[in-house]
Curated annotation (Swiss-Prot):
Keywords: ANK repeat, Repeat. This is Putative ankyrin repeat protein RBE_1215. InterPro entries: Ankyrin_rpt (IPR002110), Ankyrin_rpt-contain_sf (IPR036770). The keyword ATP-binding does not apply. ANK repeats lie at residues 22-52, 59-88. Gene3D superfamilies: Ankyrin repeat-containing domain. Signal peptide: none annotated.
């Protein structure tokens, strides 16, 4: 992940504060599927990206809900300590539930497509 950071920042000249089309940023990526506590700490400790409640527009994911969704306990624990979080709100859980529903719909649509293809 740090090598990717070097590539993006130094070789391509893309700022770390760059946002994707859906509003996600490097902190969202670091808390998502790849889950890199090292990257999260780098972004937060250097005050590059510190808003753990910033929503992406596609699913409404925040870095915190992504870390919870992808089971990155180390990142969640770091956020709890760094930002003095005492509990996860129902609103955060709703975002996670919406993500699960969306993933299920995608899986169901893919499964249905392949079932239809095998009937032809």
């Amino acid at each position: 992940m740090i090598n990717l950071l070097r590539l993006v920042v130094y070789e391509k000249g893309i700022p770390l504060t760059y946002e994707e089309w859906d509003g996600g940023n490097a902190l969202h990526v670091a808390c998502g599927a790849g889950g890199s506590l090292k990257m999260v700490k780098f972004l937060v400790e250097n005050n590059i990206l510190t808003n753990i409640h910033k929503k992406s527009e596609k699913f409404g994911d925040t870095p915190l809900t992504l870390a919870i969704s992808y089971d990155h306990h180390d990142i969640v624990d770091y956020f709890k300590q760094k930002f003095n979080i005492t509990s996860v709100t129902l609103k955060d859980l709703d975002v996670i539930i919406d993500r699960v529903k969306a993933n299920y719909r995608r899986y169901y649509n893919i499964k249905k497509y392949y079932e239809n293809q095998s009937k032809k």
